Amino acid sequence: MGTPRQFYQILKAQQHSYVPEEIVKLFAQIDAKRLELLAVNLAKYISTNLPLAINRRDGLEDYRTNPYVLMTCANVMKLHKPEDFAKFLFDSKFYMGLETSFGKSMEAAFVSAYPVKSGDGEKWIDPPEKVAEAAALEGLANEEKALKRTSSVWREIDKSVVLNGRRYLTSIKSGPNCINDTQVQAMTAAIVGNHKGWMRHSQETYKQVKELDIVVGITYGTDRTSNNKENQILVKLLGHGFVEEDREKKPGVLIDEETRSIRVYRRIGKEFWAFIGDPVQPDSAGYIFLEILLALAKGLSKGLGEASLETRINLKMASLAAALSKMMLPMGSLPEWVRKEFSESELFWFATAMTAFYDEGI
């Protein structure tokens, strides 16, 4: 079978170099009608949900951040004025918000348009079993929901599709560095503990299912640029009911040793979107990542125009700057040695970071 080190080398071996001629060929395969539909749906989503993401943050307490990193950034970036500080805080939190929950929602909107060769009833969907799990939590207190979620069977699975007697389950990760050690352990434990149950439930829900593929998907990046955490999941599965299916013909693909009907592998960047576009023959769908990017560009231009975001953003930053100004310490109330040792900018940075230790602060 080889050692884990050799396994990592195999997973990292594939190189993805930018070749303009290849991109031109991929452009020729894009479906203009599907792209337009994706763009329209995305524009609707953005015009409705992006303003909500902006409006969600009101006071300083909605901009919580690390006070130590904050003071360092403020010094390096020379953020001397409340207005500059407000823009920095807003921009950083806005980006983080888009990269997490809002970004994940947009990814879901894209995924549901595929696979390309499927019928109307064969698109990527939320697993019905996961939907049922969530429905069972309705009406429970938050504490009860938290307890129930610890025993969730489908928590790690985001999307599902059935094609040609095989069910594909995918756990979608936003980027090549977003999986941490805790998530590695959670995903590994979920697969080890639930893969037989996932197969059983799949065959109960879809009578035609004979095989199951469990795929860790990363929406951008390459095999060589990831932080290796997705590969650690695969390595940890070796010896826990899974073996390599065929190192030469199917590098990086694991299969359950007992029934040899359940596979686990990961797909990154272009290969992830090719898998989403055609799980059965992903090599024929290498253009899907371009289709997604073009739809995003078109959808953003439409959606942002309809949402009138510029005024909202400016109002939020002005409100945040005013709140930061109120946090300034009165110079006359400070000890003389403090007034001598620290500049007005340094005291502003200090006062802003200090609010992180209070309910009303950042």
Each predicted region: which residue ranges?
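Short amphipathic alpha-helical segments that mediate assembly, nucleic-acid/protein binding
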Residues: P4-F7, V19-I23, E230, G286, ...
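General structural signal for secondary-structure boundaries
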Residues: H80-D84, N180, I268
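Catalytic centers of nucleases
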Residues: S101-S202
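Catalytic cores of nucleic-acid endonucleases
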Residues: S174-R263, R267
